[in-house]
Structures are given as C-alpha cells and as structure tokens.
Design a protein with these regions (language model features):
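Nucleic-acid nuclease catalytic cores
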Residues: 84-127
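A short acidic/basic microdomain associated with nuclease active sites
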Residues: 47-63
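Solvent-exposed, charged helical/coil patches
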Residues: 1-48, 119, 125-127
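A structural signal for short, well-ordered beta-strand segments
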Residues: 55-57, 73, 121
Length: 127
C-alpha cells in the first residue's frame, strides 16, 4: 500500500465507505437497492466523486461479444461498487464483482449491503 496508486485507492475507498455509512445511518435497513443507489449518488456528489451508474459491461469469449451486463456503480472510473439489500453477502456476489473487474480491467471493488442493522462492506480485489 506504499505506492501512490494504492494510497489513492485506499483514500477513495474510505470516501465511498463513509458515504455508505451516512446513507445507512439516515435511511436504515429495509429499502430497495434503487433507493440506496439514489441516496448514494447524492452523497457522492457532495464529495465531488465522479459516479457512473449502470455501466454496461461487455462479456467476450474468444474476442466475440457473448452478452452485456450492467454493473451498479463505478466511482472515478476506478472502483466498482455493487449495492445489495440482501440478508447476506453470498459467494455469488463476490464472483459477479470479480467478473466485472476482469471484464473492465479494474482491480478494486466493493460490495455494500444495506439490509443489516450495521452496514456490511466487503472488498473485492482482482489482479
């Protein structure tokens, strides 16, 4: 984490998590993911973060497009954020974020679950 790039990712990750905590503190658990996403966007804009929602991810096999998916959010074209309002973060959620990271050539992702009494945040790294 001594590299400048690593420090930038850590700083950005802390800002994202701080925004998530604020949204969870104000809304609490129990809403749909879309409500948290909309509130998150407001918080991120306050932090002057560049946020892209529902970015299309092209999945290729042998250089041929086989399908397109949409990820929840990407912040500063760097960190993929997958929002959940689920009982638990499951292995499949990690697999989905890792596949988005791989398809986009990114290294860092977060899964944020708002359904718990205390917000749940998991980091996902793809190298």
């Amino acid at each position: 984490m001594n590299s400048g790039k690593g420090l930038q990712h850590e700083t950005l990750t802390k800002k994202i998590i701080g925004c998530a905590i604020e949204v969870h503190k104000r809304l609490g658990p129990g809403f749909l993911e879309s409500i948290y996403e909309n509130a998150f966007i407001i918080e991120w804009q306050k932090q002057n973060l560049q946020v892209e929602r529902q970015r299309e991810v092209v999945i290729k096999y042998d250089s041929v497009e086989v399908e397109r998916h949409r990820l929840d959010i990407i912040v500063n074209d760097t960190i993929v954020v997958e929002l959940k309002a689920a009982k638990n973060i499951e292995d499949v959620h990690f697999a989905i974020v890792k596949s988005y990271l791989k398809a986009l050539g990114k290294e860092h992702g977060l899964i944020i679950n708002f359904c718990k009494k205390v917000i749940e945040v998991k980091r996902v790294i793809h190298k």
